[in-house]
């Protein structure tokens, strides 16, 4: 905590901060075999990040989308071969991984999940809890993962699925800021743009089948109004919206996802908590995306450095659009669907997500310090009474984030540039000259 405050106060450099807070995990060859299964959420994710880091050192170029099945097959074969070889190095070479996992935050995140879901005791035949959760927390200052939990804690000798990065689920409305709203804020929308919430002939309905009429965009996001997201996405086009997710390495975008249903989270495969955390972290980071990892460096048995992490930033959203999205999502916490997750003494922004029949619940949000994404549901999708983004996911998010920010100074979000009256008047004049609004939902 002391080092964190010193870093934010500018008294120590980022490198000094990590030297002071870094955790060491020494990897040794598993006792039984190189393929022995690993139970810890930290271990599974760390091994994966470290293996991919060594692949990167070998010059491997990671890809997620391909022009043909032949190209995809060829890539998959090359990936599997090198992944296996690099993982064998980790297990047999006496390597040490220096990771950015904060063990105190890891404990807090695990406890938040376990405590919130302790009332759900049903288990599957293999002894795994049916009701599950996963979450990822990212340090916004560095871009590194500081905590990752792949499921509820329980005694098991079997392989434990790390749902935080190995499972893909429907995100519901939590995807709207990344896929619809921030892209449209780049194209001229503002938090105050008036949009029309009305019943659509061929589109979704709102909760309780109620419609608010002419409302500011801020209100539409805060109350997760489906018709507005649908209309704005229709104007944006799925192709344009999904490209933002691809630019942030969302790995499971399928051909069938190029429909308006994805504006409400209706994906073929889905997204992972890790992807959602890194996407929201990009919004907090003024639109700059950083590939998530927990590996800082790797050394061999002779203490020679074989890998040093260097996170590169990629602009995904324009700065002002990202800041406007952040400002809008503070309203989600103040007066919208995320009210129950609002932190007591720390400015925060976030978004809920709930899928059809309450099979999945999400809460994704951030402060200036940390971004955390939480998913709750069953491994085999099942309707859960009272499951929504504003219930169990929000409870987990708030419990963890409250603990993570204990003792930290309150930090306000950075302001966005206000549109000048001249710009607004010119915009209105152009719309009138063309006798139609420049945006599908804009009410003149």
Regions found by a protein language model. Give the residues of each.
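Mid-domain, small-residue-enriched loop/turn segments at the edges of structured enzyme/sensor domains
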Residues: 205-206, 237-278
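Conserved catalytic neighborhood of penicillin-recognizing serine enzymes
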Residues: 33-38, 42, 189-242, 289, ...
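Non-catalytic, structured segments within soluble enzyme domains
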Residues: 1-100, 246, 251-252, 261-265
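Active-site SXXK
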Residues: 6, 109, 142-143, 169-195, ...
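Structured segments of extracytoplasmic/periplasmic soluble domains
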Residues: 2-10, 20-23, 27, 53, ...
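Short active-site loop at a secondary-structure junction
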Residues: 131-133, 156-178, 191-194, 261
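Second-shell loop/turn segments in exported
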Residues: 1-3, 7, 30-37, 92-100, ...
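A penicillin-recognizing enzyme superfamily signal
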Residues: 99-123, 135-139, 147-149, 154-167, ...
């Amino acid at each position: 905590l002391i080092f964190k405050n010193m870093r934010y106060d500018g008294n120590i450099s980022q490198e000094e901060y990590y030297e002071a807070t870094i955790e060491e995990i020494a990897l040794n060859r598993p006792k039984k075999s190189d393929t022995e299964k690993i139970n810890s959420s930290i271990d599974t994710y760390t091994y994966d990040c470290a293996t991919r880091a060594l692949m990167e050192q070998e010059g491997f170029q990671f890809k997620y989308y391909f022009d043909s099945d032949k190209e995809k097959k060829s890539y998959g074969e090359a990936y599997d071969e090198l992944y296996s070889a690099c993982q064998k190095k980790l297990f047999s070479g006496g390597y040490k991984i220096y990771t950015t996992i904060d063990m105190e935050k890891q404990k807090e995140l695990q406890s938040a999940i376990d405590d919130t879901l302790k009332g759900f005791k049903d288990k599957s035949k293999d002894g795994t809890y049916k009701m599950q959760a996963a979450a990822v927390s990212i340090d916004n200052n560095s871009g590194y993962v500081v905590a990752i939990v792949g499921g509820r804690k329980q005694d098991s000798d079997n392989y434990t699925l790390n749902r935080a990065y190995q499972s893909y689920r429907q995100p519901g409305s939590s995807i709207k800021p990344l896929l619809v709203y921030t892209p449209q804020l780049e194209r001229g929308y503002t938090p105050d743009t008036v949009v029309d919430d009305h019943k659509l002939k061929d589109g979704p309905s709102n909760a309780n089948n109620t419609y608010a009429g002419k409302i500011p965009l801020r209100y539409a996001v805060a109350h997760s109004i489906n018709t507005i997201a649908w209309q704005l996405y229709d104007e944006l086009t799925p192709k344009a919206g999904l490209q933002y997710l691809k630019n942030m390495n969302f790995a499971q975008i399928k051909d069938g996802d190029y429909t308006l249903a994805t504006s409400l989270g209706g994906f073929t495969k889905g997204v992972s908590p890790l992807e959602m955390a890194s996407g929201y972290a990009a919004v907090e980071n003024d639109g700059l995306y950083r590939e998530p990892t927990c590996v800082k460096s790797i050394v061999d048995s002779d203490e020679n450095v074989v890998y040093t992490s260097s996170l590169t930033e990629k602009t995904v959203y324009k700065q002002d659009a990202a800041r406007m999205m952040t400002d809008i999502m503070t309203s989600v916490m103040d007066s919208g669907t995320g009210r129950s997750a609002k932190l007591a003494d720390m400015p925060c922004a976030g978004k809920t997500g709930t899928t059809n029949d309450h099979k999945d619940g999400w809460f994704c949000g951030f402060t200036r310090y940390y971004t955390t994404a939480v998913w709750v549901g069953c491994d085999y999708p099942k309707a859960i009474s009272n499951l929504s983004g504003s219930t169990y996911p929000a409870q987990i998010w708030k419990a963890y984030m409250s603990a993570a920010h204990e003792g930290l100074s309150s930090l306000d979000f950075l302001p966005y540039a206000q549109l000048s009256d001249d710009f607004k008047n010119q915009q209105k004049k152009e719309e009138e000259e063309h006798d139609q609004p420049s945006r599908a939902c804009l009410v003149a």
